[in-house]
C-alpha cells in the first residue's frame, strides 16, 4: 500500500526507496479501471540502483492525473468531453515538469522518509484544493444568453397564438 500505516507497508516502501531510483509517482483517479475496480490507483516509475542506499536529496516527481479521457464510471464511455491528462503526462515526462501546476511537483526522498515513506500524491501536493480553472469568453456567454432569450420569445409568441 502506498499509504498504509502498518510496519509491513512502511518496510516495503522504504525497501523501494533504498533499492530503486524512484523517478515518479503517477496518481490516477478513482474509476480509471472501472468496471473492474473503482479505487484510486497510482503507479510508480523506477530504475534499479547499483547499490542499496537512501539518497535524501534525490527528487521524486509526482503527477496528479484527474482523468484518462473516460467517464470514470462502471458504464465506461470515452470522448472529448471527458478530461484526459495522459497527453499532458507524456508531454512532461523527461522535460521540465515543474511548469505543470497544479498537476505536477517534486518531493525529496527525505520528505518521504520523514512521512513514514508514504507515497500518496496528496500527502506532498503543494496545490491541494487548487484546480485548473478555465473561463469562457464573456462575449460567447452573452451571445448564448441572447440566443436563449430569442428562443424564449419565439416560444412565448407561439403559446399566445397557437395557430
List each model region and its residues:
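A conserved structural/catalytic subdomain of Rossmann-like adenosyl-cofactor enzymes
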Residues: 1-163
Amino acid at each position: 500500500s502506498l499509504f498504509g500505516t502498518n510496519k509491513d507497508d512502511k518496510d516495503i516502501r522504504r525497501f523501494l526507496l533504498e533499492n530503486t531510483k524512484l523517478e515518479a509517482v503517477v496518481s490516477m483517479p478513482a474509476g480509471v479501471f472501472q468496471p473492474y475496480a473503482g479505487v484510486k490507483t497510482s503507479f510508480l516509475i523506477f530504475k534499479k540502483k547499483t547499490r542499496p542506499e537512501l539518497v535524501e536529496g534525490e527528487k521524486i516527481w509526482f503527477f496528479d492525473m484527474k482523468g484518462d479521457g473516460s467517464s470514470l464510471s462502471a458504464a465506461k464511455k470515452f470522448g472529448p468531453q471527458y478530461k484526459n491528462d495522459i497527453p499532458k503526462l507524456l508531454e512532461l515526462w523527461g522535460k521540465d515538469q515543474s511548469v505543470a501546476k497544479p498537476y505536477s511537483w517534486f518531493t525529496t526522498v527525505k520528505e518521504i522518509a520523514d512521512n513514514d515513506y508514504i507515497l500518496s500524491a496528496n500527502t506532498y501536493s503543494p496545490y491541494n484544493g487548487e484546480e485548473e480553472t478555465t473561463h469562457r469568453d464573456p462575449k460567447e456567454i452573452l451571445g448564448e444568453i441572447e440566443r436563449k432569450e430569442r428562443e424564449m420569445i419565439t416560444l412565448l409568441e407561439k403559446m399566445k397564438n397557437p395557430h
